[in-house]
C-alpha cells in the first residue's frame, strides 16, 4: 500500500484515466471519498496503477522471489492447446512481464480480448505457465462451470466456493488447493482477503467490467488493502476508470471468418392499448421510469410486437435457417411469456429457460451444449454476460434499453468460433405503443450501429414477416388495402 499526497501531476494522471468522471479513492482515515484537486489528505494509490511504465514513480514493489506459493499439481503435458492468436497473447504477456520485472513494476495486466476469443482457456494456459497458486474471482456462480472445466482440463487441484466463506476458511486450515474459484462476495470477508493475500500469488478478476471500482465495493477494498502479487483483469469491454487498479493493457484484435448478420425486423403496427398499458404510460415521465423500467414493461405487454417476434422465430427455426437460438428479454415476466408460448409450439425437448431463480439452470445449460437444435429463453441479467454455450448461432433481442457495454457482451454470446460460420441477430425497432415508438427506434438503432461499426456485423433488410399476423400486425400495404376496401364499399351501398 502506498499513501501519497495528491500532488498535481499524480492527480492529473489519475483523472486522465477516468475520462472526466469523478475520481474516488480511500484516504488515510480509510474513508472512500471523491478526490478533489489540491486536497491535503493522503490517499491510498492502488498498486496496479503503477503497472504502466508511463507512470513515473520511485516506489519499489515486491517481486515473486519473496514468496513461495507455487502450484504443486502442475503437469506440463496437460497445458491446453491454443490457437495461434491465443499464443500471441501469451507471448505478449510474457514479454510485458519481463519488462515489468526489470523495471520493478507490479505484475498487473488487463487482457482486453473480444467476446469469443477464448479468454478462459488462454488465462488457464498463463496460470499453468506461471506455476503460482491462483484465486479466480467471478461476479456470479453462473461463470463457475466454464472455469471448472478448463482448470480440470489443465489438471490443477482446485476448490470451488460459491456459498459461505466462513466454511471455506475452516477447510483452508487443513488444505490449501492450488486454485480457488470463488464468487466476488467472498471478498467482503477480511480474514479471507488476508489469507489469499498471504497464500496465493495470482489473482484473476473475470468479467472485470462488471465492477465499478470508483465505488466502494468489496473488490475495490480488496485491491486497495490486500493487493495480490500478480493480477489479471479479463474483459471484452473494459471500464476506463478501472485502469487505475490495473494500468497495463494487452489488446490483440481478433480476425474472424464468421459471417455475422443483423436483421431489423421492421413492421407497421396499428396502435395497441389496454388498461394496463394506459396505466404504465402515465409513469413514463416520472422518477419511477428513471432507468426505463416502464419502457421495458410496456414492451413486455406489447402483444403485436411479441407476436411478430414469435412469428419470426418460429418461421426461421422451422425452416432450418437457425438452429441454436438465444432469446433475450429484460424482464423476467417477458421471458416467461416467450418461454410458455414456445414450449407449446416445440415442447420441452427443444425449448429451455435460463431462469436465475432456478438452481438447476447451470446443469441444464451444461446439458444443452451437445444438442443440435434448441431455443434458450433467458434474461439480459442471466445470460448477457458469460453465458457459455459456444454453439449458439442466433440471437433474438426482445428488449431495447441496453447500454453499449451490455450490447457488446450480449452480441458476443453468438460470436464464439466454431466450425459453423453463420451468426444471425434479430432486433425489432417498432412498437405498437405509440408513446414509446421513437424511443424504442433510437435504442434499437444503437444496437445496430454498434454491431456494424464495432463488431463486424452486416445489416440486411428483413421483409419475410411483414404480414405474419393479420390480427395484430398491420403492414403499410395491408392497411392501404383496407382503406381502399372501405371506400369501395361506401361507394357501392
Curated annotation (Swiss-Prot):
Keywords for this protein: ATP-binding, DNA-binding, Helicase, Hydrolase, Late protein, Nucleotide-binding, Phosphoprotein, Transcription, Transcription regulation, Transcription termination, Virion
GO molecular function (one): helicase activity
Location in the cell: Virion
GO annotation (BP), single: DNA-templated transcription termination
UniProt main location, coarse: virion
E.C. no: 3.6.4.-
Residue runs in coiled coils: none
Residues at which ATP binds: 113-120
Database matches in Pfam families: ResIII
Any Gene Ontology CC annotation: virion component
Region forming the signal peptide: none
Residue intervals of the Helicase ATP-binding domain: 100-256
Motif (DESH box): 206-209
Self-association state and partner proteins as the record states: Interacts with OPG087. Might be part of a transcription complex composed at least of OPG087, OPG110, and OPG145.
Recorded family membership: Belongs to the helicase family. Poxviruses subfamily.
Functional note: DNA helicase which seems to act as a postreplicative transcription termination factor. Involved in ATP-dependent release of nascent RNA. Forms a stable complex with single-stranded DNA, and to a lesser extent RNA.
Name of the protein this chain belongs to: Transcript termination protein OPG145
Organism of derivation: Variola virus
Amino acid at each position: 500500500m502506498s499513501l501519497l499526497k495528491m500532488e498535481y501531476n499524480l492527480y492529473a494522471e489519475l483523472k486522465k484515466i477516468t475520462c472526466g468522471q469523478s475520481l474516488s479513492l480511500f484516504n488515510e482515515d480509510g474513508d472512500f471519498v471523491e478526490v478533489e484537486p489540491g486536497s491535503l489528505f493522503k490517499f491510498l494509490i492502488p498498486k496496479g496503477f503503477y503497472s504502466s511504465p508511463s507512470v513515473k514513480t520511485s516506489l519499489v514493489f515486491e517481486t515473486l522471489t519473496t514468496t513461495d506459493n507455487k502450484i504443486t499439481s502442475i503437469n506440463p503435458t496437460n497445458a491446453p492447446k491454443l490457437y495461434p492468436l491465443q499464443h500471441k497473447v501469451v507471448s505478449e504477456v510474457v514479454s510485458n512481464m519481463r519488462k515489468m520485472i526489470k523495471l520493478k513494476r507490479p505484475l498487473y495486466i488487463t487482457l482486453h480480448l473480444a467476446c469469443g476469443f477464448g479468454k478462459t482457456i488462454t488465462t488457464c494456459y498463463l496460470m499453468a505457465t506461471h506455476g503460482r497458486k491462483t484465486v479466480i474471482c467471478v461476479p456470479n456462480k453462473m461463470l463457475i462451470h466454464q472455469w471448472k472445466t478448463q482448470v480440470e482440463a489443465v489438471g490443477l487441484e482446485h476448490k470451488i466456493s460459491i456459498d459461505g466463506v466462513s466454511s471455506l476458511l475452516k477447510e483452508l486450515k487443513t488444505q490449501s488447493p492450488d486454485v480457488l474459484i470463488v464468487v466476488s462476495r467472498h471478498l467482503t470477508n477480511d480474514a479471507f482477503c488476508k489469507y489469499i493475500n498471504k497464500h496465493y500469488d495470482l489473482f484473476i478478476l473475470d468479467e472485470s467490467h462488471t465492477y465499478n471500482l470508483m465505488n466502494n465495493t468489496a473488490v475495490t477494498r480488496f485491491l486497495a488493502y490486500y493487493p495480490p502479487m500478480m493480477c489479471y483483469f479479463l474483459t471484452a469491454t473494459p471500464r476506463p476508470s478501472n485502469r487505475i487498479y490495473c494500468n497495463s493493457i494487452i489488446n490483440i484484435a481478433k480476425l474472424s471468418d464468421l459471417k455475422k448478420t443483423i436483421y431489423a425486423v421492421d413492421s407497421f403496427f396499428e396502435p395497441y392499448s389496454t388498461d394496463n398499458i394506459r396505466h404504465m404510460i402515465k409513469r413514463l415521465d416520472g422518477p419511477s421510469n428513471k432507468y426505463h423500467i416502464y419502457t421495458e414493461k410496456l414492451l413486455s405487454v406489447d402483444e403485436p410486437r411479441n407476436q411478430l417476434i414469435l412469428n419470426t422465430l418460429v418461421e426461421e427455426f422451422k425452416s432450418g435457417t437457425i438452429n441454436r437460438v438465444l432469446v433475450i428479454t429484460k424482464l423476467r415476466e417477458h421471458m416467461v411469456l416467450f418461454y410458455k408460448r414456445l414450449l407449446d409450439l416445440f415442447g420441452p425437448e427443444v425449448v429451455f429457460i435460463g431462469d436465475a431463480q432456478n438452481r438447476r439452470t447451470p446443469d441444464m445449460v451444461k446439458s444443452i451444449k451437445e444438442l443440435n437444435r434448441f431455443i434458450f429463453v433467458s434474461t439480459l441479467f442471466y445470460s448477457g454476460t458469460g453465458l457459455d454455450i459456444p454453439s449458439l448461432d442466433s440471437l433474438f433481442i426482445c428488449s431495447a434499453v441496453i447500454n453499449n457495454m451490455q450490447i457488446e457482451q450480449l452480441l458476443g454470446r453468438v460470436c464464439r468460433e466454431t466450425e459453423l460460420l453463420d451468426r444471425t441477430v434479430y432486433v425489432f425497432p417498432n412498437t405498437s405503443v405509440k408513446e414509446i415508438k421513437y424511443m424504442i427506434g433510437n435504442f434499437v438503432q444503437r444496437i445496430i450501429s454498434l454491431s456494424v461499426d464495432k463488431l463486424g456485423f452486416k445489416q440486411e433488410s428483413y421483409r419475410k414477416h411483414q404480414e405474419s399476423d393479420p390480427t395484430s400486425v398491420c403492414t403499410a400495404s395491408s392497411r392501404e388495402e383496407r382503406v381502399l376496401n372501405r371506400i369501395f364499399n361506401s361507394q357501392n351501398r
